[in-house]
């Protein structure tokens, strides 16, 4: 099994690729297979942003692994004007929907209930098979409503850290 514990900087060459859906890229613990069929175990630091398309990982044995976003069934949303697009984004955000934002469009994982809501708001929707790379969110850490185990969700915010540079 190829065991991976850490992310690494972009590399010119790599020896394996992982083709993962957004849901799989969001997990810190995952058993999956490389594009070549090798068994892979991901054991990444908890509380980090999801893996993104083109990110690199380093395996315990020193091999470099490239992450590739697997195409998924999406809804491509457009509207007649910026106000309607903003309103659609507001209603999706109010439902905590993972959302990819582009110039004049939104994308979300295909969902017939959300599709109906968007069409009632006047948006146009079209099915699309493409990699999904939604916005991570302004504050970083995981969203939850739990009171038990709150210490596990004590991640530093990504916004309002004035003067702090990565």
From Swiss-Prot:
Region (Disordered): 132-156
Location of this chain's protein in the cell: Cytoplasm
Entry-linked InterPro entries: UreE (IPR012406), UreE_C_dom (IPR007864), UreE_N (IPR004029), UreE_N_sf (IPR036118)
Keywords, alphabetical: Chaperone, Cytoplasm, Nickel, Nickel insertion
GO biological process: protein folding; protein-containing complex assembly; urea metabolic process
Role description: Involved in urease metallocenter assembly. Binds nickel. Probably functions as a nickel donor during metallocenter assembly.
Protein name: Urease accessory protein UreE
Organism (species): Pseudomonas fluorescens (strain ATCC BAA-477 / NRRL B-23932 / Pf-5)
Species classification: Bacteria, Pseudomonadati, Pseudomonadota, Gammaproteobacteria, Pseudomonadales
Protein encoded by which gene: ureE
